[in-house]
Curated annotation (Swiss-Prot):
Record protein name field: GTPase Der
Binding-site residues for GTP 2, renumbered to this chain: 184-191, 231-235, 296-299
Encoding gene (name): der
Organism: Psychrobacter cryohalolentis (strain ATCC BAA-1226 / DSM 17306 / VKM B-2378 / K5)
Lineage of source species: Bacteria, Pseudomonadati, Pseudomonadota, Gammaproteobacteria, Moraxellales
Region of interest called Disordered, as start-end residue ranges on this chain: 438-480
GO biological-process terms attached to the record: ribosome biogenesis
């Protein structure tokens, strides 16, 4: 998997951006939807066209006024502004029925300053004159693409042009090695940690096909082990960046997490553990990625501050007791070297292999030590277990009445597997499957009474044959 190009849909409210989003993604299920404090005005979805793949962003509406007065900041929400800057391609959606109004012109002027490909979509052309889209030539952004997104008309033509220069997913060449993503809020020291991790190693820096302009893969070797560092902090090394662009970038973080084997989340010790840090940990866990936490700028704290942060870690990280937390100074290198053993253990845990026999034995040992509860007088039986996947590891347990197994007992089994196999830093998915009954939900289930009835019926038939179907000739007839 490579990091995909990003296409942002922008425009005034109610011009059809969400409808076009659904046409692109062919689903109403967004990759990320309404994450508190982060994506209030945006949702993200995966889109494909032929052998091309990209991420589409549906931004909030821009421009409530229609008099053309004021500058772009009067029209644009902060979240939409950020989405536009993190996109590779802009699709500017306008309303062909309403015609061009002042807000459209202001947005058009702003788009001219970005230096990014912009495609103007004149939506809602159904029921208007064929010449209506021509009005939007005045934006100076090229030919408007006529569309009726609600009916899917014109969507294919736009996708063909939009994806023309995107790389084929079949031809993307991935670098080899453990993929390591460094994520965190702005100014927590990600760039400093990246440089410290790379050290003086000879590295090859290159832009992979299909990556966003702000993310690069950096292959390097340390102690004979190949790594690929996914760097999303590169945008901050390109001179002065507008303050609004420096806001937390959800999409770059999500892409880095999805494409990684292990994610290192960097937290600023001076600011403490904030909700956004926990959101990012949640992203990594939801994606099933192995995780290591680095509390940066630790050496700048007083003894009292360090004690306070340790108490906060115990309180706020209590839902991830299996994740290793390191106190480091990326600037001075203190504790950075200790990250590597934790990264490797987390990766090995996420990819661990074990035989079905061994896994089933561990399951039976756990059940013997602490049997499952009874349901309606019958004890739940867990019969065998096997590996069902990696990164994250999946353990599949088969048995009867598994749907009635309490959450507390499921956690007990997960903890038993973690302890026995020493799994560190990775989520573990334990899946329960019900043994299939071929007679389930059928009216002819063979109960004991029915079986007896069937046997009696067969005996009756045999008796009828012996009494009614006697031979039609006698021994006397045989002699003839």
């Amino acid at each position: 998997m490579s990091i995909k190009p990003v296409v942002a849909l922008i425009g005034r409210p109610n011009v059809g951006k969400s409808t076009l989003f659904n046409q692109f993604t062919k689903s109403r299920q967004a990759l990320v939807a309404d994450l508190s404090g982060l994506t209030r005005d945006r949702q993200y979805g995966d889109a494909t066209y032929e052998d091309k793949a990209f991420i589409v962003v549906d931004t909030g509406g821009i421009g409530e006024a229609d008099d053309g007065r004021g500058d772009i900041d009067d029209y644009m929400s902060e979240q939409s502004y950020t989405a536009i800057h993190e996109a590779d391609i802009i699709v500017f959606v306008v309303d062909a029925r309403a015609g061009m109004i002042g807000a459209d012109a202001e947005i058009g002027k702003f788009l001219h300053t970005l230096g990014k490909p912009v495609y103007v979509v004149a939506n809602k052309v159904d029921g208007v004159h064929d010449s209506a889209p021509a009005e939007f030539y005045a934006l100076g952004l090229g030919e408007p693409y006529p569309m009726a997104a609600s009916h899917g008309r014109g969507v294919g033509n736009l996708l063909e042009v939009l994806t023309a220069d995107m790389p084929s997913q079949e031809n993307v060449v991935e670098p080899r090695g453990l993929k390591l993503a460094i994520i965190g809020r702005p100014n927590v020291g990600k760039s400093t940690l990246v440089n410290r991790l790379l050290g003086e190693d000879r590295v090859v820096v290159f832009d992979m096909p299909g990556t966003t302009r702000d993310s690069i893969y950096i292959p390097y070797t340390r102690e004979g082990k190949d790594y690929v560092l996914i760097d999303t902090a590169g945008v901050r090394r390109r001179g002065k960046i507008d303050e609004k662009v420096e806001k937390f970038s959800v999409i770059k973080t999500l892409q880095a997490i999805e494409d990684s084997n292990v994610t290192v989340i960097v937290i600023d010790a001076h600011e403490g553990i904030v909700d956004q840090d926990l959101h990012m940990i949640g992203y990594a866990l939801d994606a099933g990625r192995a995780l290591v936490v680095a509390i940066n700028k630790w050496d700048g704290l007083t003894a009292d501050q360090k004690n306070y942060i340790k108490i906060e870690m115990d309180r706020r990280f209590n839902f991830i007791p299996y994740v290793k937390v390191h106190q480091i100074s990326a600037l001075h290198g203190t504790g950075v070297g200790n990250l590597y053993p934790s990264i490797l253990r987390a990766y090995q845990s996420s990819m661990f292999e074990v035989s079905t026999n061994r896994l089933t034995q561990i399951l039976q040992d756990a059940v013997t030590a602490n049997p499952p509860p009874t349901v309606a007088g019958r004890r739940i039986k867990l019969r065998y277990a096997h590996i069902g996947g990696h990164n994250p590891p999946v353990i599949v347990i088969h048995g009867n009445q598994t749907g009635s197994l309490p959450k507390s007992y499921q956690r007990y089994l997960e903890n038993q597997f973690r302890q026995v196999f020493k799994l560190e830093g990775t989520p573990l998915n334990v899946v329960f499957k019900l043994n299939e009954n071929p007679y389930a939900n059928k009216s002819d289930t063979p109960t004991k009474a029915k079986t007896q009835q069937l046997r009696q019926r067969e005996r009756n038939r045999a008796q009828k044959f012996t009494t009614k179907d006697k031979p039609r000739f006698t021994n006397k007839d045989k002699k003839r």
